[in-house]
Structure formats: structure tokens, C-alpha cells
Amino acid sequence: MSVFKASFLFLLSSSLVHGVPHSSRASRSQQCVVPSKYQASNGMADDSVAVSQAFAQCATDSVIIFEEGVNYNIFQPITATNLSNVEIRMHGNLHLPQNITAVQNIVSDGTSTWFTLEGPKVDWIGPEDVNNGWIDSYGQPWWDANPAGSSGIDNRPHLMSFKSSQATMKYFRSRKPIAWNVKLHGQDITVSHAIIDATSTGSFPFNTDGFDVEGTNIQITDSIMYNGDDAIAVGADSHDTLFTRNTIGYQTHGMSIGSLGKDPTDFANISNIRFDDVTVVDGLYAARFKSWSGGTGLVKNVTWNNIRVFNVTFPIFVTQSYSDQGASRSGTVNASSAVMMEDFTWSDFAGSINTYQPGDGSCVSDPCWYNVGLPNLKHTEALIIECHTAQSCKNFVTDNIQLYPQVLEPASVICMNATAALNPDLGFTCKNGTYSPLSN
């Protein structure tokens, strides 16, 4: 049994009491059942027009029904930005085009996202039956078409933008996404029991982020994400975010804050972010903070707690000097500036550090992007903390870090500029060498 299937079965057997749609809903008195021409056309006909019509006719106080077990071809992007109090009952299966050139032409013409959904009180509700409710994007040929030395071919679409308030996504399922999965932005959004499967049988699945989050009071729970980038990335101007009871893996880049500060004029404002009770399998990162040097802003009150890691290269990683091999930077940068970090906690970590085969398939630069500034890596590091200045990190706390390298040597640490004066409860002495937690 694969790790992905085992993880799914574990979560399926757990209680399904979370992620229930908000109870204070006005009546959804109208229904639109989306017709499909998929079966009659042997999978050739496009159902995009019918889907767009359903979203137009049932944009308010309605239920839009994709019937259970029915397949739909979505060969054109769907945009529905005037929704209000709508349930999208996704019990069918959606199929994106398999013609790479056709999709690239659509993206190059200006449509970068395949599903754009916007409005208050929007609920995406899939079925408990794992055989249905999928979006099939057929990303494997896209990944395999990526030339050597490149981090993804041009004109790849984002799968979904979901902008709402008092909203729910339950049983969202994405298989072989081309690249980015869901951009969540808004307030009071709950995601539960999602599955994202971006495991590859060939080339690396670049940029297959799970959920990119910007907003207030957003929760993601009881979900599985196997991908080739951040499982969750919390962006600027986010507050009160919870990521809990999830399993993430494959070549995941973990639970991330950022990246922040690429544009020095974009002030980062993030607070009250919690990652709790998460299992990370075979990832490049588990807990990560990433901001560019020269950035501005404040990130405050962030906690990673009760994190189990298995074969993870960088279990705890902080950098305020981030670089992206696939992105250029313009404008004037104040090299002494940094996005400030305050009140960060890493507690109750346990598991194994990937010493034998560290890294992942995303490296196309020399030195590798994730090794930049770290020339003497031993891949026994439990923690890497790179504060940009002696003032940019404040009130860092570590507690009960039980991480061990696969070679069964003592764990090590790389630490820069997390001064004792500003971080009296850091839990270890900030210097490079063997990780030796201080007694309380």
C-alpha cells in the first residue's frame, strides 16, 4: 500500500465532524442541475457552456448540482464572481483539457486561473465517496514536458481562485494539478477533508502548491496533500489561520509563511497563525518561514506544534534571505531591512531527518536554491534559523524537539543572529554545531 493511500485511509477512518457548512444560511430555494455531454460524446464534448450557464442562473440563494458519478469536460475557464449564498454540490468529476498547447494559448491570452469563484457564503461540497468529486487536470504530461534546467513550462494555469466569506470547502479533491491548486482569500473560510494528489511518475511537479492563503479566520483541517511545493503558504495580510490534523508529503515544501518581502513596498502584516497536529512524510521542509532580504513588515505569534516528520530534509527552517530560482526581482532594495519576526514557537517535533537522500527534484540551479547560503550542510540539521539582522528575530521559543538524523548521529543546528537578548527562551545557544537543548 502506498503512503498516499495509507494516509487517506487513516483520515477517512477518523471522525468526520469538522468542516460542516455554516448553519446560518438563508434558504437556497433554487437548484440548477448541470447537464453533461461527456458520455454521449465519448468524452469529447465540452461542458463549459452548460457550467457557466448554471453559475449564471443560480448565482444567488441556490444549489448548483454536479450529479454523482457524472463526468464533465471543462475545456474553457469558468468565472463566477457574483455568487451569494450558493452551494456547489460537486458530486461529479471535472476534466480539464489534455491539449497542453490549447491551455497555454488560453493562459497567454490573459486567463491565468481555470476556476474563479467569488462571493459571500459559497460552499463547495463534495461527496464522502472518494471515487467522485475530483478535478482531473492531467498534469503529468506538463511536468514531463519541462526541459532540463527549467522550473516549469510557460503559461501554466492556476487551478482555482476561491474568494469568499462565511464559506466552506469540504471534500475538495484535485488529481494531478498542472501547477498551483487553490488560492483561498477572504474571511471565515473552513476547508476540511480535502485531497490533493500531485505525486509524479516522471518529472518533478513544480509549483503544485496546495492552498495559498490570504485572509482572516481561515482553517484547513483533516486533509491530505501530496505535492511538490508548499502544502500551505500563508501570504501577506493574513490573520487567525489554523492548519490542523493534516497529512502532507511526497516532495512537499511543508507548512510555510511566505514568501514575503520580494517587493519592498509591500508591507507584510501577519499574525496568529497556528500549525498543529500534522504529519510530514518525505518532504523537503516541514515548518518554514521565508522572506526576502530588504523586505518590510511584521509577522507575529506563529506556532508549529505537535509535528511528526518522517524522512524530511529540513524539519525547521527560517530564512530572511530567501531567493527563488524561478523569479527575478526589480526595484531598489535596502539590504539591511527585513520582515520582522516576533513570538515564534516550535514545540513537540519528533521524527527523522533525511540524511541519506536529502533534497528533492526541484533543484535546477547551482548552487541549489535550497542550499544557498548554507555551504557546509551535513543534513543532520534539526533546525536552521537564519535571521537577517541581530534585531529582526524576537521572542523565538523551541521546546521538546526530538529530531534525529537517519545516520543516528546527534542532530545539529545552524543559527544566525537569534540573539540571547531578544530571544531568552530560544531553548538552545544560537550557534552552528551540535543541537544541545538547554535545560529549563
Swiss-Prot record:
Please give the GO cellular component terms listed in this UniProt entry.
extracellular region
Q: Which GO terms describe its biological process?
A: cell wall organization; pectin catabolic process
Q: Which residues form the signal peptide?
A: 1-19
SS bond list:
387-393
Membrane-crossing segments per the record = none
Chief location of this protein?
A: secreted
Please list the residue ranges covered by the PbH1 repeats. Answer: 215-236, 238-259, 265-288
Name a GO molecular-function annotation.
galacturan 1,4-alpha-galacturonidase activity
Q: Which reaction does it catalyse?
A: [(1->4)-alpha-D-galacturonosyl](n) + H2O = alpha-D-galacturonate + [(1->4)-alpha-D-galacturonosyl](n-1)
> Which residues carry out catalysis?
229, 253
**Subcellular location(s) of the protein:** Secreted
Q: Which InterPro entries match?
A: Glyco_hydro_28, Pectin_lyas_fold, Pectin_lyase_fold/virulence
Carbohydrate attachment residues: 82, 99, 269, 301, 311, 334, 417, 432
Query: EC number(s) on record?
Result: 3.2.1.67
**Entry keywords, A to Z:** Cell wall biogenesis/degradation, Disulfide bond, Glycoprotein, Glycosidase, Hydrolase, Repeat, Secreted, Signal
- Similarity comment text for this entry: Belongs to the glycosyl hydrolase 28 family.
- Fetch the PANTHER family from UniProt: EXOPOLYGALACTURONASE C-RELATED, PTHR31736
What is this protein identified as? Probable exopolygalacturonase C
Origin species: Aspergillus niger (strain ATCC MYA-4892 / CBS 513.88 / FGSC A1513)
Its taxonomic path starts at: Eukaryota, Fungi, Dikarya, Ascomycota, Pezizomycotina
Gene from which the chain derives: pgxC
